[in-house]
C-alpha cells in the first residue's frame, strides 16, 4: 500500500553538480494499460492479490486467470471488487483451462503479462508474448520446517497441506 503513493511520480533536486544548482527533475509514471495475470495453485488468494493490488493502484485494467484447481480465492476477490467503485470493465476474473488462456499472452491489447508458476511454462509464455512486457515469478520454494520433536506429525502434515492450498 505504501508504494502506491509513489506511483504518480516524484520531484527531485538535481544538485549533484554545481551546474545543476537550482534545477529539479521530475519523473512520472503512467499506467501501462490493460494487463493479464496468471496466478498459481499454491497460495491462490495471496499470489493473485499481489498482482491485482498494484494494477488497481496504478489504474490499469486487468484480466486474471486463476489456476484451474484453485479458482475460488480469485473469484471471491472478483466479487468483492465488483462491489467497489472501480469502473465497469476495470477487471475480469476468467477461470479457464490452460488451452483457453492463449489470449492472455498473444492479444496485443494486453500490454503486460504477469505469470507465477513453473519455469517451463513461464519461459514458454514469454516466448509467445511478442513485444508485451512480461513479469515472471518462477519456481518458488516455500519451504516448511517441522521440528523433530513435533508431537503430532500427522496434524503438522495436514496443516501444511491446508495452508499450501488454502482458498
Positions of the model-derived regions?
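Hydrophobic packing residues within well-ordered alpha-helices of enzyme cores
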Residues: 1, 74-77, 104, 125
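Structural signal for hydrophobic packing residues in well-ordered secondary-structure cores
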Residues: 1-12, 81, 85, 108, ...
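N-terminal Rossmann NAD(P)-binding subdomain characteristic of aldehyde/semialdehyde dehydrogenases
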Residues: 1-52, 91
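Glycine-rich phosphate-binding loop at the start of an alpha helix
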Residues: 29, 46-49, 68-71, 75, ...
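Short coil/turn connectors at secondary-structure junctions
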Residues: 29-34, 58-60, 87-89, 108-111, ...
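PLP-dependent aminotransferase-like
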Residues: 48-102
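ALDH superfamily catalytic-core signature
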Residues: 85, 120-167
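Phosphate/diphosphate-binding loops
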Residues: 115
